[in-house]
Amino acid sequence: IIMIADMNCLKIINDEHGHDKGDEALFKLASYLKKHFGPIGECYRIGGDEFCVLAPDVSIEYFEEVCQCFRASLEAEDQETAYPFSASMGYVRLDESGIDECVKKADRKMYEEKRRKGRVRI
């Protein structure tokens, strides 16, 4: 499984609360990704506010359970911060189409979720 995660509202955090809070939010998101997905795969920051999780040896059902725990953690953190704290994620099963195509599919799914209403979208 490959997942692409993108922090929501980073520009708002930077503009309204300062870049130090934006950096803090990115660090928190990375920490939550590592906490939840680290035991089942590898987590990478691939761009400004974009992250990637590779979990090739886990079932989709278990991955979805981990996603729900991750989502609950982000929602709880959002209640505790003075700024909006959320992320959108998209994931796909790795297949024979190759890693590049799977990344594109996961990225498209993430952007579909980002367009929907709600704070933490998976």
Predicted features along the sequence, with ranges:
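Short hydrophobic/aromatic beta-strand micro-patches
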Residues: 54-56, 92
